[in-house]
Amino acid sequence: MNIKLITLLFLLLTPLIEASDRNTEIDALLDGLHQDAHEANFETYFARYSSDAIFLGTDKTERWTIEEFKDYAKPAFEDGHGWTYVVVERNWEGKGQIKWFDEILFNEKLGHCRGTGVVELKNGEWKIANYALTMLVPNAIAVEVGVQTKEADKP
């Protein structure tokens, strides 16, 4: 094969290989996050977040800095329970050092949920900068859930 052709193929394929490697790294980051939560591995779970990360939980009051989220999660992790969300599907977008994702998860108590977030490449390592967990409500019962939510919000 001609050296120019080999060089051209290398130059054309390298970005695809790098993108695939990045995608694999991001999937491993998120899969590891869910595994660490399931196994109640406090240190490795929180090491996956950036130091300035924000976590949004299912309750309207749950907007936490990573330190606030650690305080919330610590008792569950110390009891060895953590929490279990099984990934059903995941999608992500973005290029370069910032990507965003959405994933459908399943939890025994809450049913299907959605996790969305942003990951950022910092010092050669992907970190979660933002994660939001929401409950998925089927349209057929959305009004009923809305009524219950408004009732629960009353002082």
Describe each model-derived feature in a short phrase.
Residues 2-9:
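Sec-dependent signal peptide recognition
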Residues 91-98, 119-127:
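A short, structured loop/turn motif at beta-sheet edges
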Residues 122, 130-155:
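Low-complexity, intrinsically disordered terminal/linker segments enriched in charged
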Residues 10-18:
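Hydrophobic h-region of N-terminal signal peptides that target proteins for export
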Residues 22-25, 68-112:
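Surface-exposed, charged secondary-structure patches
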Residues 39-52, 56:
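Short, well-ordered alpha-helical segments enriched in acidic and aromatic residues
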Residues 20-37:
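Short N-terminal segments immediately surrounding and downstream of signal-peptide cleavage
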Residues 53-64, 75-81:
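A short gly/proline-enriched turn/hairpin at secondary-structure junctions
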